Amino acid sequence: MPSETLQNQIASLPENPGVYLMKNAQGEIIYVGKAAVLKDRVKSYFVPPSRLEPKTRQLVSQINELEYLITGSEQEALILELNLIKRHRPYFNVRLKDDKGFPYLKITLNEKWPRIYITRSMADDGGRYFGPFASTRSVRHTLQVLKELFRFRSCNRTEPEKRSRPCLEYDIHQCLSPCTGKISKQDYDHLISQAILFLEGKQDKVLKLLAKLMNEASARLDYETAALRRDQISSIKEVIEGQQLAARVSGEQDAIAFAQEGDLSMVQVFFIRRGKLIGRESFSLQGTREEKPGDILSEFVKQFYHSSTQIPPKIVTQYPLSDREILEKWLSERRGGKVQITAGLRGQPKDLINIVAENAREQLKQARIKNLSSAATLTDALEELQTALGLPLPPQRIEGYDISNIQGTNAVGSMVVFENGKPQKAHYRRFRIKTVKGADDFSMLKEVISRRFGRLNKDNAGESFARRPSLMLIDGGKGQLSSVKETLDTLGLEGQAVIGLAKEFEEIYLPGKSEPIRLMANSPALQLLQRVRDEAHRFALGYHLNIRHKSGLTSALDGIPGIGPSRRRLLIKTFGSVSGIRQASLDELLQVKGINQALALSIKELL
């Protein structure tokens, strides 16, 4: 039976489209959903438990509070839902595993001599992006194929440096050396256009263009260029031969199928362009236990194409999608042309889906073999923590905190993040202590916690600070824990789960409990906590030592008249360290911009 507060929240829900957020007693968002009519959708959860699926029953039993956001349409609600799931990664939502940093290929069309390289973020900077790819390995393979076919430059300057002779890349046939004039601007632009067509799956157009360029080069007796075009044609034909499918397909389409075991689903996507398979990717989905097949695929389609740079006119799926009409409308708007979603239930689409599904099953099998021991251990650890600490759910997100200083100098704090038992280094954050003087670790912890949670509900919070942790781990005992608990209470976060892990006896302290919890030394839960604690310590210490090192460099150079911040940075950049500057010859010092003979002599004398 919902609490009176929850019943009032449900009763006050509007009959508008929008997004609803369900929170547990700790204030953690555990589910995000969208609805054409908010009131009707949310009320459908609060029926007799016997009418609910087991997973939904567990969700409803955890709901303590509701929030909602009204949108102008169901399509707007879909986009907002996607952004909130990506930001908060709620425990009960189906979600792409590790979706925060999928790699893309970027073509820098905003540069005179464009490059093609791997990136994990997209910007509105005039570049062209392809992806996302499921792994760094797959995007590196694609980049390697492109490099061998088109030999574009890979130097990491926006403008290639003028050189008198080509570099090693040219000698090993990996670059056409625009920096030495070995290729004209027009020919280089042709090359990049061919690479784009290739990535779009239009290899037949590339072949026609290359054949034309080969014949033109041969006619003007430019046999070196003609031979290059011939080799490119041969290589592309080899690639095309490997793209034939057993099933007969035509046109441009993506085919999507999945295989499931427990809470993990492996989704396989085949990218078909002009009747040929130009690529395939595998993605892991979490939170799929007891979900309907059509719902699982709907969630994948939403989350994948939300960040995809290429949307085909046709998408074939293994099962009918629960949100097909709204997804078609949304994808058509994103593509700028009609998108049709169909289920491959018979005929040629079914033959194609069967192949994709077989690949998904094989990928799931390989993933299970690879991750069996580690995944089982992490699951055991999280479930053991839930039981030992009395948490409502296994702690999906654990944040670890530590302080590092020497008698109050160069004091820093660290925050490390583990999700589902694995470190999420992109979310790590470090804090330089600003308000505390002297060696007062308790006050330093208070500052770090205040700054971290002060960003919680800000628009610019970023992914590191936007979500509340399921569990906070403090490196220390009762004193450190009490200090942090006091700060959390002051911030209105009384329900936040927090523990201290004391290093001497590896005892776990909980707020309000006089006796610590002691776990067995071989306990997966204790080993996970130790790893989080040690990682927070390592991250804080590394930052502290880095600041000390820079402080030492600064003080040594500050004693030299004429060396200000700009020259100091330039010297360190050129020679790497004070030791490197000390060992530099007078002539080497004079090569540094802004260093004249008198200043160089002063540096040599004073160092």
Curated annotation (Swiss-Prot):
- Entries under NCBIfam families matching the protein: PRK00558.1-5 (NF001824), uvrC (TIGR00194)
What family does this chain come from, according to its entry? Belongs to the UvrC family.
Q: Which residues form the GIY-YIG domain?
A: 15-94
Supply the alphabetized keyword list: Cytoplasm, DNA damage, DNA excision, DNA repair, Excision nuclease, SOS response
The name this protein carries in UniProt is UvrABC system protein C
**Cellular component per GO, a single term:** excinuclease repair complex
Matches recorded under PROSITE patterns: GIY_YIG, UVR, UVRC
User: Which Gene3D superfamilies does this one have?
Assistant: 5' to 3' exonuclease, C-terminal subdomain, GIY-YIG endonuclease, UVR domain, UvrC, RNAse H endonuclease domain
Q: Does the keyword NAD apply?
A: no
Molecular function (GO) terms for this protein are: DNA binding; excinuclease ABC activity
Q: Where in the cell is it found?
A: Cytoplasm
Taxonomy, superkingdom: Bacteria
Q: How does it assemble?
A: Interacts with UvrB in an incision complex.
Q: Write down the HAMAP family for this protein, in alphabetical order.
A: UvrC
Q: What does this protein do?
A: The UvrABC repair system catalyzes the recognition and processing of DNA lesions. UvrC both incises the 5' and 3' sides of the lesion. The N-terminal half is responsible for the 3' incision and the C-terminal half is responsible for the 5' incision.
Q: Which GO terms describe its biological process?
A: nucleotide-excision repair; SOS response
